């Protein structure tokens, strides 16, 4: 089978993003981590099988990774033509910590916004970037 053209075959839908309260760090400070939720829709006429996802987070203006989040999207069961997956939720293990209230952290002058690039791997093919999401500067409660 020819390699899957992921950007032409899979589409991110129902995308939402923000900063999730990851609780307290070992020093008792609030920790916020960037989080993206979405579904994938199969926009082809065929069933697609064996897809893995990797979200790569970066602070805007920086090259280095600021956390990754991997998920095995689906295997042999596949994703039928035109249908959508369950909701996936990718969050970085890295985030911001602060003594101040969480909403104050988002307004802090040192706060740098974060972007997540979503990469897709089909079977044994190379990872391909599917989309890029700027994380909304909002608090997520769940």
Annotate the PLM regions:
Residues 15-20, 53-58, 91-95:
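Generic short beta-strand segments
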Residues 40-44:
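Asparagine-centered strand-capping/turn motif at beta-strand->loop junctions
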Residues 1-35, 62, 133-142:
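Low-complexity, acidic Ser/Thr/Pro/Gly-rich terminal tails and inter-domain linkers that flank the onset
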Residues 28-32, 47, 106-110:
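A generic structural micro-feature
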Residues 68-141:
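Short, solvent-exposed, Trp/other aromatic-anchored flexible loops in extracytoplasmic proteins
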Residues 16-25, 37-39, 69-75, 99-102:
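Short structured motifs
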Residues 45-64:
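Short acidic, flexible loop segments centered on an aromatic residue
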């Amino acid at each position: 089978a020819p390699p899957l053209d992921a950007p032409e075959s899979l589409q991110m839908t129902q995308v939402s993003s923000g900063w999730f309260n990851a609780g307290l760090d070992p020093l008792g400070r609030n920790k916020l981590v960037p989080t993206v939720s979405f579904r994938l829709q199969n926009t082809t006429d065929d069933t697609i099988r064996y897809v893995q996802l990797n979200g790569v987070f970066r602070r805007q203006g920086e090259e280095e990774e600021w956390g990754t989040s991997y998920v095995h999207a689906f295997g042999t069961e596949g994703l039928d033509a035109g249908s959508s997956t369950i909701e996936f939720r990718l969050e970085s293990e890295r985030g911001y910590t602060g003594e101040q209230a969480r909403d104050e952290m988002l307004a802090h002058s040192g706060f740098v916004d974060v972007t997540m690039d979503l990469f897709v791997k089909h079977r044994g093919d190379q990872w391909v970037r599917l989309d890029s999401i700027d994380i909304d500067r909002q608090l997520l409660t769940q």
